């Protein structure tokens, strides 16, 4: 098999998963570089980069790169492709060629996003791309149009991937295996895929109408022609809120596996509760979108509903957190690097969840909307939730993917540096938000200097952690410590073929004997 046949025309779920992981790692470094530019600008009062337009282009690109080209490709494309077929005993994904197309739509999409910043003044709209700022008056030229096309491609990629994962998870498992006997990671990817399938078409509709408003003189979002910019916000957030659950749900699945494994348990605590909690989160995620819009002047009854509905999501989330803690209870805990990431995840995700409950209150949110408190909140659940879950999964399954082991001491040190960095970066932002510092500005009054400086120092510590991780991965490949026989394979099906598994697995159907 030639290099080109293997890597460009691949129909193998393991190879495509590897492509997704490499692409996501690369995009993650681009997104990190952008975030360091943001923190460099905000490290001291005064201007570093120039005007707010270039600053907002960087902020917008940082969000898009991290969401669409780092977290989703790694969690869904990388871990999803590698593990879902192995965990259900399928020979591959249901639609292997469509799987390849889903991946190869992402590099062109990334290219279009980068192109958007090189023409005119760039797309400095924020990741929400709200009109009228995103309209053709405030953003003349092709920048926003290129960003919209980038989102179109990334969206098509995700929709096709979602169809593939739904079909695979439901139809490719052995007949004897009920859906309620599949591992939690498979469930998490299945639910994520359903969310993608239902939410992305709404985003596509919204940005397509924005595209025609900009180029074909329609007025969907222009009051002068009977349109309404608030309609765009509803369409965007009907996608945008499920999207944040799309980013965290596969992480929930990863953490369930890692915690169970390193607590020495043969199953997670409360399997059914975990499944129904994820199903509930997936459903509720669709009926809370307007909590992002408490400041647009909605009716008081509407605000009351969205406040209460948002708070209800804390219940299934709490079920998951306490089930992880119950899984740990009474276990023989192995303090390996993946376990450290998982414990860090549980702690920091819970803090992020608590600030989310604060922001759910529509009255409080009037004061905190577009302030740094919101930035702190969602970076606790993303930068320390999604990213910690990715690193837990990566350190846990690295031997499965490569056949080599990471250096345990280096990996623990990396956790320590990263934990320090992200907390020093984002904890002070709660204080800035409560003190009234607004988001998306490149400068600030000098009263805010202390916490901003600390936050920027934290970002440099996190950068050090990223460099450490690159070294740790290099060291693992250079030292070639092989895994001879993985343990606990009876309850962790993905490991039964050895490390790494052969190119083709389950070529003949798996024999499944269901325990009564």
Curated annotation (Swiss-Prot):
Pfam families: COX1. It is an enzyme of class 7 (translocase). O2 binds at residue 245. InterPro entries: Cyt_c_oxase-like_su1_dom, Cyt_c_oxase-like_su1_sf, Cyt_C_Oxase_1, Cyt_c_Oxase_su1_BS, Cyt_c_oxase_su1_dom. Residues 1-12, 88-95, 172-183, 263-270, 329-336, 402-407, 480-516 are mitochondrial matrix. Its EC number is 7.1.1.9. It is found in: Mitochondrion inner membrane. One of its GO terms (molecular function) is metal ion binding. Residues 42-51, 119-141, 214-228, 288-299, 359-371, 435-447 are mitochondrial intermembrane. Na(+) binds at residues 41, 46, 442. One of its GO terms (biological process) is electron transport coupled proton transport. It catalyses: 4 Fe(II)-[cytochrome c] + O2 + 8 H(+)(in) = 4 Fe(III)-[cytochrome c] + 2 H2O + 4 H(+)(out). Its cofactor is heme; Cu cation. The keyword S-adenosyl-L-methionine does not apply. Cu cation binds at residues 241, 291-292. Heme a3 binds at residue 377. Mg(2+) binds at residues 369-370. Component of the cytochrome c oxidase (complex IV, CIV), a multisubunit enzyme composed of 14 subunits. The complex is composed of a catalytic core of 3 subunits MT-CO1, MT-CO2 and MT-CO3, encoded in the mitochondrial DNA, and 11 supernumerary subunits COX4I, COX5A, COX5B, COX6A, COX6B, COX6C, COX7A, COX7B, COX7C, COX8 and NDUFA4, which are encoded in the nuclear genome. Component of the cytochrome c oxidase, the last enzyme in the mitochondrial electron transport chain which drives oxidative phosphorylation. The respiratory chain contains 3 multisubunit complexes succinate dehydrogenase (complex II, CII), ubiquinol-cytochrome c oxidoreductase (cytochrome b-c1 complex, complex III, CIII) and cytochrome c oxidase (complex IV, CIV), that cooperate to transfer electrons derived from NADH and succinate to molecular oxygen, creating an electrochemical gradient over the inner membrane that drives transmembrane transport and the ATP synthase. Belongs to the heme-copper respiratory oxidase family. This is Cytochrome c oxidase subunit 1. It comes from Buteo buteo. The gene is MT-CO1.
């Amino acid at each position: 098999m030639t290099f080109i046949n293997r890597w460009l025309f691949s129909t193998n779920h393991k190879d495509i998963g590897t492509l997704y992981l490499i692409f996501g790692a690369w995009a993650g470094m681009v997104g990190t570089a952008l975030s360091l530019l943001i923190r460099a600008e905000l490290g001291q009062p005064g201007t570093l980069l120039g005007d707010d337009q270039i600053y907002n282009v960087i902020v917008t690109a940082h969000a898009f790169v991290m969401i669409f080209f780092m977290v989703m490709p790694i969690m869904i494309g990388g871990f999803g492709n590698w593990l879902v077929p192995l965990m259900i005993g399928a020979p591959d994904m249901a639609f292997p060629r469509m799987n390849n197309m889903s991946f190869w739509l992402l590099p062109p999409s990334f290219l279009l996003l980068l192109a958007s910043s090189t023409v005119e003044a760039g797309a400095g709209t924020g990741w929400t791309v709200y009109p009228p700022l995103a309209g053709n008056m405030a953003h003349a030229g092709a920048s926003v149009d290129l960003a919209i096309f980038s989102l179109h491609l990334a969206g098509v990629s995700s929709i096709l991937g979602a169809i593939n994962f739904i079909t695979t998870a439901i139809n490719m498992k052995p007949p004897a295996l009920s859906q309620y006997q599949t591992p939690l990671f498979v469930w998490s990817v299945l639910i994520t895929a359903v969310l993608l399938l239902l939410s992305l078409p709404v985003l596509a509709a919204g940005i397509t109408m924005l595209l025609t408003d900009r180029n074909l003189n329609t007025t969907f979002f222009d009051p002068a022609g009977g349109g309404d910019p608030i309609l765009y916000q509803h369409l965007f957030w009907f996608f945008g809120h499920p999207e944040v659950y799309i980013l965290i749900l596969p992480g929930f699945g990863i953490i369930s596996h890692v915690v169970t494994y390193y607590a020495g348990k043969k199953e997670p605590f409360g399997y059914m509760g975990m499944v129904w909690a994820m199903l509930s989160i997936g459903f509720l995620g669709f009926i809370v979108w307007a909590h992002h819009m408490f400041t647009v002047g909605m009716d008081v009854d509407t605000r009351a509903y969205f406040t209460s509905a948002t708070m209800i999501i804390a219940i299934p989330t709490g079920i998951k957190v306490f089930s992880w803690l119950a899984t740990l209870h009474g276990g023989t805990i192995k303090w390996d690097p993946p376990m450290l990431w998982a414990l860090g995840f549980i702690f920091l995700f819970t803090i992020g969840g608590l600030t989310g409950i604060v922001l759910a209150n529509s009255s409080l949110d009037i004061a905190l909307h577009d302030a740094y408190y919101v930035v702190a909140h969602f970076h606790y659940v993303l930068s320390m939730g999604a990213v910690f879950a990715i690193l837990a999964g990566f350190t846990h399954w690295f031997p499965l993917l490569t056949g080599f082991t990471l250096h345990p001491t280096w990996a623990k040190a990396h956790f320590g540096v990263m934990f320090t960095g992200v907390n020093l970066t984002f904890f002070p932002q709660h204080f800035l938000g409560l003190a009234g510092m607004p988001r998306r500005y490149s400068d600030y009054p000098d009263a805010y200097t202390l916490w901003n400086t600390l936050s920027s120092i934290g970002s440099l510590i996190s950068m050090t952690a990223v460099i450490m991780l690159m070294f740790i991965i290099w060291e693992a490949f250079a030292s070639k410590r092989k895994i001879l026989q993985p343990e606990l394979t009876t309850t962790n099906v993905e490991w039964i073929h050895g490390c790494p598994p052969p190119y083709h697995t389950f070529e003949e159907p798996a024999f499944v004997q269901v325990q009564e």
